[in-house]
Regions:
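Short, charged, surface-exposed hinge/linker loops at domain edges
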Residues: 1-6, 40-70
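Short aromatic-glycine-(Arg/Gly/Cys) micro-motifs in beta-strand/loop hairpins
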Residues: 10-25
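Hydrophobic residues in alpha-helical membrane-spanning segments
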Residues: 24-27, 62-64
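A short, exposed loop/beta-hairpin motif centered on an aromatic-Gly-Thr core
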Residues: 26-37
């Protein structure tokens, strides 16, 4: 599933992993040994976050799509 949520990806010296955070979805983050793996894992976590929110009847924020203009 394609999504348009903004991701912030950075290297963690402490964990020796790339960390991908999704600020628009509280608590949604993933990691990976490569940049691409972190992004791929974040996409999975976004989809799981949305499915869980639906199951719990919670509001799902609309993506702001900031990166579309970068």
């Amino acid at each position: 599933m394609m999504n348009k949520y903004e991701m912030i990806i950075h290297w963690s010296e402490e964990d020796q992993l790339f960390i991908a955070e999704v600020p628009e979805l509280p608590g949604c983050m993933a990691d990976g040994h490569s940049y691409q793996e972190a992004v791929s894992n974040a996409v999975i976590m976004i989809n799981e976050w949305i499915e869980t929110a639906k199951d719990l009847g919670r509001t799902i924020p609309k993506p702001k799509g900031k990166l579309m203009y970068a």
